[in-house]
Structures are given as C-alpha cells and as structure tokens.
C-alpha cells in the first residue's frame, strides 16, 4: 500500500491508515490520488472522500478543509468529518428533506447560506451512507 492518509479534525484524528488510492472532494471537483502523485496543496469542499484499501472502498464525509500531498503522505485537515459506517441512512434522508425545506423557506442571505450549507452536508451524508449498500464509488 502506497499512501499514508491522515484525516485530522479539531476534536480528533478521524483516519490514520495506509491505502492504495484516495478520492478527495476539492473545491474544483473530485481529485484522485495514487502513489507517486506530484506534491500539492488543495482546498477541500463539503463532500465524500473515498479511500481504497485493496479492493474495498471506505467513505468519509468531509466538511471542508485542506489537503497536502507530498511523498505519498496525505495530510487532511478538516472542519469536521464523519465515517459512512456511523451514519444512519434514515436519519440522513430525514435531515436532507428538512434542510431542503429550510432552504425553500429562507428569506435573508444569511438564512439562505446557512440552509445551503446544511443541505450540502446532508447530501454528502446520504451519499456516503448509500455507498455502504451498493459499493458504487460515484
């Protein structure tokens, strides 16, 4: 396994393991990283990070942050994160519906921004939880 991946949130180490591949949700789209990748620093968006260890994919929801890639070391600093394995799909779907309603009811720019952020987080949580049932990475 070629990559050492560390995901660190303000309150804990979310992930610290070796893997063969990682797909990151960057601010400009998904970014795949394999062993030998060129050094880079990138902003991360709210979305699902996927990690491949042998033939198994693991999904982790990231709530924005930064990633640094150098010498097969990936350091990911995030505002928050949640592993797909701890997400309750029914609860996540309910939150998706509620956040969509909040967005529709929002009046001020601040309310719209906050509702949009909640909606994006809810969508990412549902997407990650769904990967547990069908193992599709997209």
Swiss-Prot record:
Q: Which UniProt keywords apply?
A: ATP synthesis, CF(1), Chloroplast, Hydrogen ion transport, Ion transport, Membrane, Plastid, Thylakoid, Transport
- Tell me, in one coarse class, where this protein mainly resides: plastid
Does the UniProt entry include the keyword Chloroplast? yes
Kindly list the GO molecular function terms attached to this UniProt entry: ATP binding; proton-transporting ATP synthase activity, rotational mechanism
Q: Which Pfam families match?
A: ATP-synt_DE_N
Protein localization:
Plastid, Chloroplast thylakoid membrane
Q: How does it sit in the membrane?
A: Peripheral membrane protein
* Function of the molecule: Produces ATP from ADP in the presence of a proton gradient across the membrane.
Q: Which family does it belong to?
A: Belongs to the ATPase epsilon chain family.
Q: How does it assemble?
A: F-type ATPases have 2 components, CF(1) - the catalytic core - and CF(0) - the membrane proton channel. CF(1) has five subunits: alpha(3), beta(3), gamma(1), delta(1), epsilon(1). CF(0) has three main subunits: a, b and c.
In Swiss-Prot or TrEMBL terms, this protein is called ATP synthase epsilon chain, chloroplastic
Native source species: Galdieria sulphuraria (Red alga)
Lineage, opening ranks: Eukaryota, Rhodophyta, Bangiophyceae, Galdieriales, Galdieriaceae
